[in-house]
Design a protein with these regions (language model features):
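Glycine-rich phosphate-binding loops of nucleotide-dependent enzymes
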Residues: 1-194
Length: 194
């Protein structure tokens, strides 16, 4: 199945969701509303029922709100639900994006540079979150340059350099691949502590 040329809403309904390298939150909406936007993709309510505030729509809206709060709790932002998303620090905005992506109930979650701009503590928290996502049975596809994070969370790794695949395999194979070492690591690195 190809998703090329499909609209974002259609892709999400197919079970594919993503976050962006550059944070894309709705800054003037609350943290909760940002996640609810992601959940609305799975909504059955149409424009007319939403506009008329019909009973079924109100029930669905309540379910969407509850689901959004569960996703905020999953990423550790439940206490920030009423704050404006634009007021969150970068690390929390990235977590918010993950919560919004998870609200679509994806089978596949694409994370584009999720550790970009994060400090060590935030990156460790992100790794723990990704492990919890994987435990939920969601496939995570990661585009990332933080090799410690990649080695920590990955079962399989494909390495590209200037658009060309240079290696593919298990983390242990990748960390010892001479092309990967030359392109990204600069020297052999001991990841055995991870």
């Amino acid at each position: 199945m190809s998703i090329e040329g499909r609209k974002a809403r259609e892709i999400a309904r197919l079970g594919v969701s993503r976050t962006f390298q550059n944070v894309e939150v709705f800054g003037r909406m609350t943290v909760l509303e940002n996640v609810m936007v992601g959940r609305h993709i799975q909504s059955r309510a149409g424009i007319i029922s939403t506009g008329l505030r019909l009973m079924g729509m109100r029930r669905e809206e309540r379910q969407i709100r509850e689901s959004a709060m569960q996703h905020l709790a999953f990423v550790g932002l439940e206490n920030r639900a009423t704050e404006l998303a634009g007021n969150l620090p970068l690390g929390e905005q990235k977590l918010l994006e993950v919560a919004r992506a998870l609200a679509t109930d994806p089978k596949i979650l694409l994370l584009d540079e999720p550790a970009g701009g994060l400090n060590t503590r935030e990156t460790e928290g992100l790794a723990a979150l990704i492990h919890r996502i994987l435990e939920q049975g969601i496939t995570v596809v990661l585009v990332e340059h933080d090799m410690n994070l990649v080695m920590d969370i990955s079962d399989e790794i494909m390495v590209m350099n200037f658009g060309e695949k240079i290696a593919e395999g298990k983390p242990k194979q990748i960390k010892n691949d001479p092309l990967v070492i030359e392109a990204y690591l600069g020297e052999e690195v001991d990841y055995s502590d991870l």
